[in-house]
């Protein structure tokens, strides 16, 4: 900042207006500061109090501000400019927008500022300008590195090896192509072509001729039946007609397995001991002779079953006495 533009030291109310804060907030801050200062005054030495009273004068305030400005201005002049920063060096070659021309007075001021600066700053500026990036320098550096690599013996061997490999890989394979072209590429044989080939085979012709000879031979005719054989066959057929075939024994229907526990408990699945083997044999004979079986209901007991079986084959002439004789003796 320039000395002329720098504002002088202001009192409390002027500082509040200069900063732009509200008066209420500024007054509260000033009151708190004055209260703290009054609390610290008894502990301050008399020399410091004298300096504090001198600080209220305008001449003292101006001298302090001038000293501050001179001290910081020297530091600002020693510092490097933003234009010489390394981050802006790469953009130095790019076209810039036309700016205002500098007058003679501006040039003199810049020269004076450079002369006032230390020689170290000039050296830094020269170094930063020398390290400017450009595509031309990058290409030249790469070419120089390649030349250095090629001059080394290991690099020469590697390039020679790569050259030989490329020559071998790029040679045309004429001989292999001729062999590949000589191989026929016809389709696979079909069923008709295989059959035609088999027909042309001489062995197949011999086998086919033998089969034809066997088929061409006349088959032997069956001998004519004699006069006695005719009558013998007729007698056999009459005997078979007189003795009819026995009717097939019908299979007993099995009781289907119960689906619930209660049916299994209250249903009779086996024959009780009351039926003797004699009665069972009689029952088989009657069923084979008659060819009809009576269906047994599930709710019948063994005693009812036995009686029902007998009633199924009783005639009108039978009596209760005859029925009782057929029962077992132990009843």
UniProtKB/Swiss-Prot annotation:
Q: Predominant location of this chain?
A: cytoplasm
Swiss-Prot/TrEMBL keywords? Cell cycle, Cell division, Chromosome partition, Cytoplasm, Cytoskeleton, Mitosis
Q: Where is this region: Disordered?
A: 90-127, 150-183, 206-331
Cellular location(s): Cytoplasm, Cytoskeleton; Cytoplasm, Cytoskeleton, Spindle
Basic and acidic residues bias: start-end ranges: 154-165
Coiled coil feature spans: none
Q: Name one GO biological process term.
A: chromosome segregation
**Which GO cellular component terms, listed alphabetically, does the Swiss-Prot or TrEMBL entry include?**
cytoplasm; spindle
Keyword Cytoplasm found = yes
Q: Which domain of life is it from?
A: Eukaryota
- Start-end of Polar residues biased regions: 267-280, 288-299
Q: Name one GO molecular function term.
A: microtubule binding
Q: Which Pfam families match?
A: Msap1
Primary role: May have a role related to the spindle integrity, which is essential for proper chromosome segregation.
- Protein family per UniProt: Belongs to the SHE1 family.
Protein name, please? Mitotic spindle-associated protein SHE1
Q: Which gene encodes it?
A: SHE1
């Amino acid at each position: 900042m320039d000395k002329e533009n720098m504002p002088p030291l202001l009192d409390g109310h002027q500082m509040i207006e200069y900063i732009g804060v509200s008066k209420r907030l500024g007054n509260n801050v000033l009151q708190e500061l004055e209260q703290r200062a009054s609390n610290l005054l008894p502990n301050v030495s008399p020399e410091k109090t004298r300096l504090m009273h001198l600080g209220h004068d305008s001449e003292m305030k101006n001298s302090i501000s001038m000293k501050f400005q001179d001290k910081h201005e020297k530091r600002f002049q020693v510092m490097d400019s933003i234009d010489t920063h390394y981050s802006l060096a790469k953009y130095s070659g790019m076209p810039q927008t036309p700016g205002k021309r500098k007058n003679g007075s501006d040039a003199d001021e810049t020269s004076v500022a450079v002369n006032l600066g230390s020689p170290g700053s000039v050296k830094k500026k020269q170094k930063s300008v020398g390290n400017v990036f450009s595509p031309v320098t990058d290409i030249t550096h790469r070419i120089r590195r390649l030349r250095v690599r090629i001059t080394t013996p290991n690099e020469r061997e590697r390039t020679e090896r790569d050259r030989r490999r490329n020559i071998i890989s790029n040679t045309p394979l004429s001989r292999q192509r001729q062999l590949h072209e000589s191989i026929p590429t016809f389709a696979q044989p079909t069923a008709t072509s295989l059959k035609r080939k088999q027909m042309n085979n001489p062995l197949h012709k011999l086998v086919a001729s033998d089969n034809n000879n066997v088929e061409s031979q006349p088959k032997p005719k069956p001998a004519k039946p004699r006069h006695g054989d005719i009558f013998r066959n007729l007698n056999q057929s009459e005997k078979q007609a007189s003795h009819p075939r026995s009717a097939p024994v019908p299979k007993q229907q099995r009781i289907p397995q119960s689906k619930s526990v209660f049916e299994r408990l209250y249903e009779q699945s086996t024959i009780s001991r009351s039926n003797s083997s004699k009665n069972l044999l009689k029952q088989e004979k009657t069923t084979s002779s008659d060819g009809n079986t009576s269906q047994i209901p599930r709710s019948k007991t063994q005693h009812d079953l036995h009686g029902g079986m007998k009633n199924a084959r009783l005639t009108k002439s039978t009596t209760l006495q005859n029925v009782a004789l057929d029962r077992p003796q132990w009843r």
